[in-house]
Design a protein with these regions (language model features):
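Internal alpha-helical scaffold of NAD(P)-dependent oxidoreductase catalytic cores
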Residues: 1-31, 44-81, 126, 130
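Short pre-catalytic strand/loop immediately N-terminal to key active-site residues, enriched for Gly-Thr
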Residues: 28-34, 86-91
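Aromatic-residue-lined binding/catalytic grooves and analogous aromatic/hydrophobic interfacial grooves
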Residues: 39
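Short, contiguous hydrophobic alpha-helices characteristic of membrane insertion segments
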Residues: 43-44, 94
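NAD(P)-dependent Rossmann-like dehydrogenase/reductase catalytic/cofactor-binding core
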Residues: 69-137
């Protein structure tokens, strides 16, 4: 159990680096690590993939990078500013029978959601193993 002073100090430190989410159960920390601690690498990997796909479709490397970065930044900003859940935002930018719908159908056919779930699960299991390895309770 942490004291109020300890909690306030932790909040000041962590808020300087980004978002702070308190969890009630200590065993949830492995999931937090899998989503938030490892999450930036997932986003960077998506940006890499978008860049590579853009270049494969004929864009120059600098164009591909700028578009991939701006797309991820803009979508993140919109999601942060909106009270709508991400699924609703996705629906709002997807025209039936359009280009986005075609891309999302490809993601779905390739098991995109399940792939992300497996990756996060693998990270959580590794976080747990590292905790045991390094003496966490």
């Amino acid at each position: 159990k942490t004291s109020t002073t300890q909690r306030q100090l932790a909040e000041r430190i962590l808020l300087a680096a980004g978002e702070l989410v308190w969890v009630d159960q200590e065993d949830a920390l492995d999931a937090v690590t899998a989503v938030s601690g490892s999450g930036p690498a997932y986003v960077f990997y998506l940006i890499e993939a978008l860049e590579e796909a853009a270049m494969a479709e004929g864009l120059l490397p600098n164009e591909a990078r700028r578009l991939a970065l701006a797309t991820c930044a803009g979508a993140s900003r919109l999601a942060l500013q909106s009270s709508e859940p991400p699924a609703r935002l996705r629906e709002q930018v997807t025209s039936k029978g359009g280009t986005t719908a075609a891309a999302l159908a490809s993601f779905k056919a390739d098991g995109f959601v399940e792939m992300v779930q497996r990756a996060v699960h693998s990270a959580r299991l590794r976080a747990r193993a590292m905790g045991e390895e390094y003496g966490a309770p």
